[in-house]
Amino acid sequence: MKPGLPKTRKGRLQAALAVLASMCAVDGFFVEPNWIEVTHYSLSAPVAAPLKIAHLTDLHTKGLGFRERRLLQLLRQEKPDLIVITGDTISSTANYEEESVVLRELHAPLGVWLVRGNWENRYTLRGESEFYRANGVHFLANRSAAARPDIWLIGTNDSANWSAEVERAFASVPENTYRIALFHSPAFFSQSRARYDLALAGHSHGGQVRIPFWGPLWLPSGVGPYVHGWFSSGGTRMYVSRGIGTTLLPVRFACRPELAIITLQPMAN
């Protein structure tokens, strides 16, 4: 073996690792955060007619940037009947004005519906209901409403750091309707799952940064075992979306942002 060969191999290894690290950095900071994945799911449900739901969560928007414009483009292509947003549209008080620009661009025949996340609870907006109403959004804070006569939406405050008043939220929901619960922190599923048919949640960002063969680098409190995807218990199902935006650092790795499209199909007789 030539005396200089080990050094050459070491140098090549270091160079390869540097290239790999650079590629991961480019992917994590510039590619993945803007590379929205559209996921499609179909559920058989006791509903009168099909319903196509677009589930958004964790926008953490700062206005109409590239990612938001791409999201709007995808929504126009999907043409959902209903858009639901399960919290964390902002990251600071200053973002509300920027958020309004995005909210005004969201449209669906059965409306846009929103619940608080932990960031809205941290930076509570005075005149919150009026703000959302002015931007064409139905705000569900521990209350319910009919999306259609056979389908009711129930929105609760984020249970991680606010009062989720379950009794109040479900008080006016008629019997024999399909119930869709909207909340931010998926760990709430363990406390409330017997009351509805389907739940939609976010908060986890899917981990945001996932290490291959390991999993999420970090998860916030309020996630529990419900990091991403479908979960079921006692006939109730929940979907946890990876969300659209980022927090702490503007990076995603092995965890693309997600627009979840869930279609309810009438059950066969």
Model-derived features: positions:
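Membrane-embedded segments
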Residues: 47-143
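Catalytic metal-binding/acid-base residues of hydrolase active sites
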Residues: 60, 89-90, 119-120, 144-145, ...
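Binuclear metal-dependent hydrolase catalytic cores centered on His/Asp/Glu-rich metal-binding motifs
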Residues: 127-137, 141-144, 148-183, 187-191, ...
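Conserved beta-sheet core of the metallophosphoesterase superfamily
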Residues: 186-263
